[in-house]
Amino acid sequence: LDVRNFIKTDANYRDAGVDWELTQKNISKNIAPKILNITQGFLGSDENNFTTTLGREGSDYTAAIFAYCLNAESVTIWKDVPGVMNADPRYFENASLLNQISYREAIELAFYGASVIHPKTLQPLQKKEIPLYVKSFINPLLKGTSVSKGVDLEPHLPCFIVKRNQLLISLSSIDFSFIMEENISEIFGLFHAHKIKVNLIQNSAISFSVCVEDKFGQFNELNAILSKKFKVDFEENVTLYTIRHFDESAATTVEKDKTVLLKQISRETMQIVTKE
C-alpha cells in the first residue's frame, strides 16, 4: 500500500503535521484490518498530493498513526537495542533494561533527549491507551520494553540521558537591571529564529543561562545580536546530563572527574552541565 494515499498532512514537507480527520477517513475506509497490510513509514502527502515527510522518527510515528486510526490492540517497534534502557551503554557500563514505562515517563525521557522513542509517536497511542512494545530485531525473542498506562518505571532506577557538543550561554544585564519576562520572551524568540534548541534554562534576577544545541551553526550570528543588549559569556563543547529519578549515587557517577559548570534540580529531575 502506498502510505501517501492514507496519511494526509500540511505542506511543511520535512516535518509535516498530520491532518487527522482526513487521515482517519482514508484509513478507516480503505484498510481491511483482518488481513496483512504492508506499507511504508515516514511519508505522507499534502492536499495537492505532493510527497511530505513526517520528521524525526517518522516511521515509528507512522505505525502510531495507523494504530490510532484502526483502534489497534498494540504497536510493536523494532530497534537494534534490547528495549528502552535506563542509560546509553556507550557511556554507562551498567545500563539496565526497563521492563515497563508509563506513557508519561516515556514522554519525559524523550523530551530530555532519550532517542529510542519520539514523543510524537507516544501521543496518539496515549490518547487511546494503546500499548507500545519496543523490541530487538537482533534478538526478537527477548521481551523488550512495554509502554502503557500504569507504573512509571519497572524496575525503578535512575535514568541517564547524555547530550554532548552543547553550548552553555550566560546572559547578564549590562546595567544590573532585572531580566524580566519581556527580556526572556525576546531571547527565546531569537533562539527560535536561529533554529537553536534550548535544552536547559536557569535564571536569576540579573542573569539568564541556557544550554543549547547549535545544530545549524547559527550561534555567531545570534551572539552578535545578543551582545547589543546583554553581556554574553559562553562555553563550547560542554555535556548536558539529565538524570530522571536521581539519587546521590547517580549524581556522583555523573560528576566524577568532571568540572561542573551548572546544576539544576527539580522534584524528579537533575540536570548537570559539565566540561570534561
Question: Predicted segment positions?
Answer:
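A conserved regulatory-domain signal marking ACT and ACT-like small-molecule sensing domains
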Residues: 143-276
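Flexible loop/turn segments at secondary-structure boundaries
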Residues: 7, 45-47, 84-85, 140-143, ...
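Nucleotide/pyrophosphate-binding catalytic subdomain
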Residues: 1-117, 122, 275
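Electropositive, surface-exposed helix/loop patches at the edges of structured domains
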Residues: 30-46, 109-133, 170-184, 235-254
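Short coil/turn connectors at secondary-structure junctions
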Residues: 1-3, 32-35, 47-49, 70-74, ...
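A conserved active-site cap/scaffold subdomain adjacent to cofactor or substrate pockets
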Residues: 100-148, 153-156, 164-166
